[in-house]
């Protein structure tokens, strides 16, 4: 009888011990506050939130013509796309991405033209507009339109090709500075002279003959150089504008932060 009583008491004490253990463990869990931590991890950086407003305004403009929120600067090439392409084609061919081309660790917003699809990726060399994030807000950097081209080189220099006619063609090589301004590397341009066209160069990126030096380059050599820059420009992986509403920037996977820096 005593042995049965002792056994019953021992089992009861064991159950109490296990019950207490479970209570202590459960009491710790609410202090971890996992839902709040997960929510914090999902908050996008300020630049993504502001860039999203720009891309959303482009989407709305292409989709239904609403231009109320479309930035004044950087819209020219985008407006041309809407004029010559049908709605669905424009939403498919216009792309957006984030890529750090200034080297400051904060990416720029690039909007451009998708020229091909490989696998699940969408690629193109042409950029229509670039925006950066400086002093807590979006800042316009550059844009192009018909008869001009803006492309990115492997060293993150930006190359603009264009002109106002046969006698005035331009090739500008610039780099984006951390403050959001473009710095000039060099500018080549053609200009009429007595015996035809001359090729001029300066480092101010202003096509002013008097502030430039005439080179010994022929127009043919100048055009070859323009073509070489175009051929050596890099492909950019874009996300199609049509997918912006459902995925935003999430599929970029922070690939825009330059791995080599």
Please provide the spans of the model-predicted regions.
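Beta-propeller blade termini
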Residues: 92-101, 147-158
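Blade-edge motifs of beta-propeller repeat domains
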Residues: 32-90, 135-149
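Acidic, small-residue rich beta-repeat scaffolds with periodic aromatic anchors
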Residues: 22-65, 161-261
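Short consensus segments that form the blades of beta-propeller domains
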Residues: 85-89, 116-123, 162-165
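Sec-dependent N-terminal signal peptides of Gram-positive bacterial secreted proteins and lipoproteins
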Residues: 3-26
């Amino acid at each position: 009888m005593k042995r049965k009583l002792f056994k019953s008491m021992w089992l009861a004490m064991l159950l109490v011990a296990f019950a207490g253990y479970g209570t202590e463990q459960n009491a710790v869990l609410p202090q971890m506050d996992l839902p709040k931590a997960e929510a914090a991890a999902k908050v996008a950086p300020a630049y993504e939130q502001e860039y999203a407003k720009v891309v959303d305004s482009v989407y709305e403009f292409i989709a239904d013509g609403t231009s109320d929120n479309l930035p004044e600067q950087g819209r020219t090439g985008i407006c041309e796309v809407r004029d010559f392409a049908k709605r669905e084609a424009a939403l498919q061919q216009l792309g957006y991405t984030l890529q750090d081309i200034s080297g400051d660790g904060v990416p720029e917003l690039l909007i451009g033209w998708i020229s091909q699809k490989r696998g699940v990726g969408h690629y193109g060399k042409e950029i229509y507009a670039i925006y950066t994030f400086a002093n807590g807000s979006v800042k316009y950097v550059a844009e192009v339109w018909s008869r001009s081209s803006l492309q990115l080189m492997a060293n993150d220099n930006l190359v603009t090709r264009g002109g106002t006619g046969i006698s005035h063609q331009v090739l500008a090589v610039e780099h984006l500075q951390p403050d959001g301004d473009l710095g000039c590397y060099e500018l080549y341009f053609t200009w009429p002279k007595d015996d035809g066209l001359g090729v001029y160069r300066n480092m101010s990126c202003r096509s002013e003959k008097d502030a430039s030096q005439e080179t010994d380059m022929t127009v043919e050599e100048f055009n070859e150089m323009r073509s070489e820059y175009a051929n050596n420009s890099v492909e950019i992986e874009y996300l199609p504008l049509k997918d912006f509403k459902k995925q935003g920037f999430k599929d970029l996977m922070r690939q825009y932060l330059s791995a080599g820096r």
